[in-house]
A protein has these predicted regions:
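Hydrophobic, well-ordered beta-alpha structural blocks that scaffold small-molecule cofactor pockets
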Residues: 1-111, 127-154
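Short, ordered loop/turn segments at secondary-structure junctions
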Residues: 120-122
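Internal alpha/beta core interface subdomains
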Residues: 110-118
């Protein structure tokens, strides 16, 4: 094991971040793609705060040809160009679409995607070794309401 700090002298912050990143498997420079640049996808692009913690969105894709170009400093391509424009070092995709979800996931897995952040509210299958993190705001609000009611009863 590595020694990250020295007694009475503190920590070398860069060394600590690099060491923790290695231990936790975080690259801190992940290339992320976004599928779906509608209202939610655009909000995600605009927010894009994870570029300071885990990486950044390097490309977005949408089925609307009118969205091709650049938004918030990120290149946006038509979904038909996914295979030809896919960043080769990308392992994470954010899904913010409502149609063709399984087909899109299948295409992403063929390209080597290993992690999916899912905003789709759709059920889809992934192969072994692909991790999915579902984000459901409705469920989060329901859980919050339950906790608040529980606190009120105490």
């Amino acid at each position: 094991t590595d020694n990250f700090g020295r007694r009475g002298r503190g920590y070398d912050v860069k060394h600590l971040i690099d060491g923790l990143s290695e231990v936790l498997g975080l690259g801190l420079d992940e290339s992320i793609i976004l599928i779906g640049v509608g209202n939610l996808g655009s909000a995600i692009l605009k927010y894009n705060r994870w570029q300071y913690t885990v990486g950044k969105i390097v490309c977005g894709y949408d089925m609307d040809k009118n969205k091709e170009g650049e938004r918030f400093g990120v290149k946006i391509c038509h979904i038909d160009k996914l295979e030809e424009t896919f960043p080769s070092d990308c392992k994470i995709a954010i899904l913010a679409i409502s149609e063709n979800v399984q087909e899109t996931v299948d295409r992403l897995m063929k390209l080597g995607i290993k992690g999916i952040v899912d905003f789709t509210h759709s059920h889809f299958m992934v192969q072994e070794g692909v991790e999915v993190q579902t984000v459901d705001v409705v469920v989060a609000i329901q859980e919050l309401v339950i906790k608040m009611k529980s606190n009120d009863q105490e």
